[in-house]
């Protein structure tokens, strides 16, 4: 006699970190994911860490997230540090693995309809270190990953100053979402 069996893995999200977004609408076939490069802090003239082509200067990044939906959007954010306060922590063959994140490196925020929030260098430092450092922070390079069941508007503002303070560079990028398949899909 045949029975109606259910495989519990079909109900489980494909990565344990995504469980923080649960419960998701049953009909949701995928999640929207955004990957923002973060460059923060001071890179000195005598580079501390062979910083992969980062020139001397002061760097800042701000990530803006807006929920352009008419429902509240749960948003999962996590930081994958590559260079942490001047120390290279994820140069190949080493990797920044989301499965090994500490609690303060992840955050879930519920964005009301049409609401916005931002993550800047202070917030990224708090997520990576557990607290905001005082004074000038050494170079930190990381990936801020943003995941939601709803499509969001995500922009990133990068600023850089040379060591002498002569001039400033500002760049704004708008991030397109990547689709993450749920429950074994894509």
Where on the chain are the PLM-derived regions?
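Gly/Pro-rich, tryptophan- and cysteine-flecked surface segments typical
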Residues: 2-186
């Amino acid at each position: 006699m045949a029975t109606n069996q259910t495989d519990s893995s079909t109900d489980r999200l494909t990565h344990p970190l995504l469980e923080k977004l649960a419960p998701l609408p049953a009909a949701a076939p995928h999640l929207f994911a955004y990957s923002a490069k973060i460059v923060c802090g001071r890179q000195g003239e005598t580079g501390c860490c062979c910083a992969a082509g980062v020139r001397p200067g002061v760097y800042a990044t701000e990530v803006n997230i807006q929920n352009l939906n008419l429902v509240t959007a749960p948003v999962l954010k996590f930081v994958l540090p590559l260079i942490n306060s001047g120390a290279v922590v994820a140069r190949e063959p080493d990797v920044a693995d989301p499965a090994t994140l500490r609690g303060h490196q992840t955050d879930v925020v519920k964005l009301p309809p049409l609401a916005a929030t931002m993550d800047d260098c202070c917030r990224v430092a708090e997520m990576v270190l557990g607290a905001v450092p005082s004074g000038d922070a050494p170079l930190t390079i990381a990936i801020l990953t943003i995941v939601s069941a709803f499509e969001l508007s995500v922009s990133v503002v990068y600023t850089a100053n040379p060591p002498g303070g002569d001039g400033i560079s500002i760049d704004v990028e708008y991030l397109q979402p990547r689709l993450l398949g749920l429950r074994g899909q894509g």
